[in-house]
Amino acid sequence: MFFRFIILLLSFNLASQEYEITSKNIEIDTELNTINYEHNVVFKSDDIFFTADKLKLNQENESFIAYGLPIKIKFYDGIEFIEGEAEKIEIDSEVLKLSKNVSIIKAGNKINSENMIIKLSNDKS
């Protein structure tokens, strides 16, 4: 089924962390247990914020794959918030993967790569 919304706000729980997703369009596939968000996607949680063109949520394992030209992202690496961009982002409960034209700024230094893997810390203490 395909539903078209001007703005869709949904809250879920990812590894005991709440998040909110906003987009113009949503497609829910109950057979595959997936939700696809398209157009002006905004993902917000305590540790990760990004804007993308598309986002696919797999509800079985609570993993995400986002696409954009580029995706703008801000995330907490356990020490500080880091800003950057990439064309593809994959998130599961423990790992943030950025790929295709990755560029981040950490501690004032710009880092460029084709692929980057960041282990997420669920503990801010």
PLM feature spans:
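Sec-dependent signal peptide recognition
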Residues: 1-8
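N-terminal signal peptide c-region/cleavage motif recognized by signal peptidases
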Residues: 11-12
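N-terminal amphipathic/hydrophobic interface segments
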Residues: 16-125
